[in-house]
Amino acid sequence: MALDTASKSQIVNDFQRAQGDTGSPEVQVALLTARINGLTGHFKANAKDHHSRRGLLKMVSQRRKLLDYLKGKNADSYRNLIERLGLRK
C-alpha cells in the first residue's frame, strides 16, 4: 500500500547520495522495496485480489529495471544496496 510521509522521508534519508536527493536509483529501489513488502503482506489476507497483484508485478519489474541499470553503472553501489535491503539470499 502507500507509504506515509514519515516512513518515506526516513527511507529517502537512509539511501540518498547527497542532501535533497530523491531520484537516484538507490532511493527509488528502496521506496519500491518498501511498497512491495507492504503489498506482500496484503496478499496474505487477500489472495484473490488480482487487480493489486498486477500492480505488484509492475513494481517488481520496475525495481528489477532500476537494479539492472545500477548494476551496469555502479556495481559497488548495486552490491551495497542489495545487501542493505536484503534482496538476494
Swiss-Prot record:
Coiled-coil annotated spans: none
Pfam family, one: Ribosomal_S15
Gene Ontology biological process terms in this record: translation
PROSITE patterns on file: RIBOSOMAL_S15
TM region(s), chain numbering: none
Record keywords, A-Z: Ribonucleoprotein, Ribosomal protein, RNA-binding, rRNA-binding
GO terms of molecular function: rRNA binding; structural constituent of ribosome
Top-level taxon of origin: Bacteria
GO CC, alphabetical: cytosolic small ribosomal subunit
Family: Belongs to the universal ribosomal protein uS15 family.
Described function: One of the primary rRNA binding proteins, it binds directly to 16S rRNA where it helps nucleate assembly of the platform of the 30S subunit by binding and bridging several RNA helices of the 16S rRNA.
Quaternary structure, from the entry: Part of the 30S ribosomal subunit. Forms a bridge to the 50S subunit in the 70S ribosome, contacting the 23S rRNA.
Record HAMAP family: Ribosomal_uS15_B
Name recorded for this polypeptide: Small ribosomal subunit protein uS15
Lineage: Bacteria, Pseudomonadati, Pseudomonadota, Betaproteobacteria, Rhodocyclales
